[in-house]
Structures are given as C-alpha cells and as structure tokens.
Amino acid sequence: MARPRAATYDDQRSQILRAAADLFARRGYTAATLNEVASASGVSKATLYHYFSDKHALLEDIVSSHVARLQGIAAEAGAPPTEPPGSTHGAAEARLRRLVRRFMQAYADAQSEHRVLTEDVKFLDERARGAVLDGQRQVVAAFAQGIAACRPDLRAELHKPMAMLLFGMINWTFTWLRPDGVLTPADLGDIVVDLFFGGLPAVAATLAPAQADARPPELR
C-alpha cells in the first residue's frame, strides 16, 4: 500500500527512506527495485530520483542514518552526568542499564532499518561501508566505556569483548520481540542487564506488578 504524500521536502525524503527500508527488509536489497520504492512511497520515479541518485544511495542513507541515531543515543544515555567525586558504582550500572534500554527501544522503533543494517551493509561500496563500520565501532566503544565504569578492575583488553557479548544479547531481538507481546523493549533491556551483571540467578522470576498490570488483559 502506498504511503500518504508528505507535505515538505524533508518529510517526503524521510517517507521515501522509511518505505525503502521496509521494502529492503521485507524483500532484500538486491531483489527490491526503485519502481517498488517509488510505489511504496507514493511518489513518481522521477520524484524519487530528485532525492536519491540510485538504489545504493538509498541504502547508504538508511544505514548511515540509523547508525548516527544509535551514536546519538550512546552519547546521550551513556555519558556520565555531573557527579561528585567518588560517585557510586551503582550510578555507572544505572547508566549502562539506561543505555541498553534505549537501544532496545531504538531497535523496536526501527526494525526495518536495523534489519537492513545487519543484513545489507555488505552491499555498500568500500567508502560507505567503512564510514558505517566506523560509526558502529564508536557505538561499541561507548558500551565498552560503560562496562569499564561498572567494573574498573577489569583488564582493559576485556572491555571490548564484554561489550560485544552484551551486543550479542540485544542485536537480534528485533527479529522475535513482538510489539504486542508480554515483554516491552524496556522489560527485555532490564532482563539483559540483570543477566549480564549477575548471570541467570540475577534475573527476576516475574515481571514487577506495575509492569504486569500494564499489559493488555489477554496477555496477563
């Protein structure tokens, strides 16, 4: 189904990008055509070319914009606030928990874009792929710094591997976490952090009452 037409240049450009991301995620980058992107966006092919020179340009914008959003979240949620000297270890854990929760929500809000990033980045040319990979490294570094703040006793060479293990728990949740399911992205983010910090014994046996009561009756 074609999307409604956007009112402004930026709105229409964003509309085309979102439609292309949905299409690439559903059909695959190589199978999707610009005619299909134009149709899904509710624009003519000529209008599509006004914004993007080719399919590669669409792919590059989708993945680079998504990574830039993740970088912004990492910078905002992972940055330590102004704290007095000797601030508690618990503050560092709270920042890492906030970071994971924000990433889980970002993945849920941009499932198509995240799928395109994980599956289609290999189709970018060397320059564009390098820029995206640099952005991803910065995101991993932000997580590694968060882990180091939680465990300052860890050897420095363990910070990145620990961050990659944490990403291993969250990066593919978009493939199975249902928007109408029992767990919200924030719920699952908390479980991930509990599991990461404490292992299986640290995971709560049930959802907190407030979380459980917020679910639709049919899911209780």
Q: Which sequence ranges carry the predicted segments?
A:
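Amphipathic alpha-helical packing segments from all-alpha helical-bundle domains
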Residues: 68-74, 126-151, 160-164, 187-190, ...
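Hydrophobic alpha-helical connector segments
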Residues: 61, 75-109, 163-166
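Amphipathic alpha-helical segments used for helix-helix packing
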Residues: 107-127, 175
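Key DNA-contact positions within bacterial/archaeal DNA-binding proteins
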Residues: 46
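Hydrophobic alpha-helical segments that form the core
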Residues: 102, 156-175, 186-199, 220
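Basic, helix-initiating cap at the start of DNA-binding domains
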Residues: 1-27, 31-43, 56-60, 65, ...
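N-terminal intrinsically disordered/low-complexity leader segments
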Residues: 1-11, 18, 81-84, 204-220
